[in-house]
């Protein structure tokens, strides 16, 4: 029995009727869906957002084919929670994944992969997982194999994926199974990481690529990590096409998360820059090449017009790296704009007009309701969903968001609507208010100038936090 089979009959019957209407209409062929997420890529780390140093011609080309989302947010200021929001359409605190390396994606959550698998999609996950451990038997990544973490074991096939090739958490961006060589040798960045002696450069990093229950892949793991991932993604897509099945895949690159490692060829493309920039930008360019490879493959299979690609990052750039948040305040682990406003675009040839730059506030929690809207599918039950469909934004230029975006991280909380942002960095003891339409860099706190706006937003935030708390306690689950 699948999770979806436990959903109340009336909801399932509603979805079944919608499914029949879609399947019977030949003009509504189900699109392929690729959700790409980079790791710690800052808003200002791509050419399409104005970076003059980084070389990202393929990502920029893809962005130009669709809508660039200037005001797109990660649901959290760090990795794991944002990923939970993509999977569920819910704020990560609802799912009890509040921080990196905490919690896991619970059985009671309904994921986008599960819903699409029920709709006949082939489903695959590639890259970082970070939503639980991938082994009970061996030490792996940050948490895998430790007795205290056995409760957090949950693999992608438990959440709707047919297949996967993924790591529990971070890996080096080049030679991902090997500890990086010393910073002095120019082969890795030393941003808080202990460098190792050259003679120890072949020591294992301590992570594996998992492909099944207690099963790892040990082949083709040398070189650029983004290329290693794409070597698995392309065959998955080809198999799906050959089987005449629409496909859904989450492509979660590790780049440019620490430890950032780049090969000589990519470093040399930035020879005029300092070593740290050579390595950081080099690994981004290596990832960009794989995005170009992905697009060429879609074109060669004549499915580029049948495929939706949504691209974003999981949070802002890491501190003390060459990563850029552009004009936005602070970086990763902050709920100010630089920590959660991330580069993003959406493309679907023939459906989303190219060359757009949209200021509509959107968030990673919007992915699930947007995809369901495109497919004309209802969510299977009535649990709270924080995201909303941005399909009318992408196709009809809708201007205003229906519901604000709430954020919770550590001792920070924030409430963002179409114009204003209410934020606290001390668990709600004090607040600041910013007009994001006129002050994108959050330089002027206007809470004393707009007390009525702040008061209403505080009340709404308080109600939302209570709803989130109820969900976190498991009140949304049917078991």
Which stretches of residues belong to each language-model region?
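Formylglycine-dependent sulfatase
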Residues: 2-8, 13-14, 22-432, 436-479
């Amino acid at each position: 029995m699948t999770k979806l089979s436990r959903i109340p009959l009336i909801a399932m019957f509603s979805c079944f009727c919608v499914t029949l209407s879609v399947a019977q209409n030949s003009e509504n062929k189900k699109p392929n869906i690729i959700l790409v997420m980079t790791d710690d890529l800052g808003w200002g780390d791509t050419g399409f957002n104005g970076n003059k140093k980084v070389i990202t011609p393929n990502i920029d080309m893809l962005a130009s084919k669709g809508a660039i989302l200037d005001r797109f947010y990660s649901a959290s200021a760090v990795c794991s929670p944002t990923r939970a929001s993509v999977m569920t359409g819910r704020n990560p605190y609802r799912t009890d994944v509040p921080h990196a390396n905490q919690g896991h994606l619970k059985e009671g959550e309904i994921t986008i992969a599960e819903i699409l698998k029920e709709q006949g999609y082939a489903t695959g996950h590639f890259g970082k997982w970070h939503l639980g451990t991938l082994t009970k038997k061996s030490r792996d990544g940050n948490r895998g194999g430790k007795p205290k973490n056995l409760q957090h074991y949950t693999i992608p096939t438990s959440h709707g994926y047919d297949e996967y090739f993924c790591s529990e958490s971070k890996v080096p961006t080049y030679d991902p199974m090997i500890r990086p060589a010393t910073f002095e040798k120019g082969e890795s960045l030393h941003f808080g990481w202990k460098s190792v002696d050259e003679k120890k450069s072949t020591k294992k990093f301590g992570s594996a690529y998992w492909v099944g229950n207690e099963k790892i892949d040990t082949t083709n793991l040398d070189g650029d990590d983004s290329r290693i991932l794409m070597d698995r993604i392309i065959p998955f897509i080809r198999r799906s096409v050959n089987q005449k099945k629409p496909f859904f895949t989450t492509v979660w690159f590790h780049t440019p998360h620490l430890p950032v490692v780049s090969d000589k060829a990519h470093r040399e493309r930035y020879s005029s820059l300092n070593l740290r920039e050579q390595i950081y930008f080099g690994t981004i360019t290596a990832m960009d090449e794989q995005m170009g490879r992905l697009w060429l493959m879609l074109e060669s299979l004549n499915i580029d017009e049948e495929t939706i690609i949504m691209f974003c990052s999981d949070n802002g750039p890491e501190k003390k790296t060459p990563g850029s948040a552009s004009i936005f305040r602070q970086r990763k682990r902050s709920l100010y704009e630089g920590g959660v406003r991330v580069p993003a675009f959406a493309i679907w040839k023939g459906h989303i007009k190219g060359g757009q730059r949209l200021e509509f506030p959107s968030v990673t929690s919007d992915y699930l309701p947007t995809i369901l809207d495109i497919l004309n599918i209802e969510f299977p039950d009535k649990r709270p969903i924080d995201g909303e469909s941005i399909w009318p934004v992408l196709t009809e230029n809708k201007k205003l968001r229906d519901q604000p975006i709430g954020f919770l991280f550590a001792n920070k909380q924030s409430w963002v609507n179409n114009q204003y942002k209410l934020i606290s960095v001390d668990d709600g003891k004090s607040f600041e208010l910013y007009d994001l339409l006129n002050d994108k860099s959050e330089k002027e706190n206007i809470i004393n100038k707009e007390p009525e706006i702040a008061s209403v937003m505080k009340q709404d935030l308080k109600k939302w936090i209570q709803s989130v708390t109820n969900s976190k306690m498991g009140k949304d689950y049917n078991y």
